[in-house]
Amino acid sequence: GEADRIIFMLTRNNGITHAVAKSIRKPNSKFGARLEPYMHVALSLTQGRGTLRTITQTTTLHAYTAPIMGDYTAYTTAAVIAETLTTNTPPEETPPHYALTHGALATLAHKKHHPHHILARYLTQAMQLAGWPLTTNTCIHCGTPTPTSYHTPHGTLCPTCAHTATT
């Protein structure tokens, strides 16, 4: 119905999934704020019609929404984390992505580090999980191990390849 909402979620064991929260938009909803973005919750689900399940019960484990939404930089960082998660998480590799995402959001909400540092670490680790490890100790062009390197948007270059690229 009009008061229902489809909720996107990352689960510990079943990957990214969607479920219907019935009557969530009504003022007396039993779910209400528990299913806002960036919440860590425990859910009970039943099989609904078709492929969507229905949320029947929810318990808040950690409320990250308020601290994240109250800080614009933290909010935009969380949005990039969510977008990266939705585009780069294969269903068969859920546990590492779940742990990485939960850790990033918890750190962001508790303001333990600057949001840009949290995002850089998250993206680096998410890229590695997706099979695109960041290489900083070898040249991306010739493969030479190089302690002295030149950084480009595509990776690290040794002095010889950097000189060739600029001439």
Where are the predicted features?
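Non-catalytic alpha-helical scaffolds and adjoining flexible linkers that form interface surfaces
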Residues: 1-6, 10-167
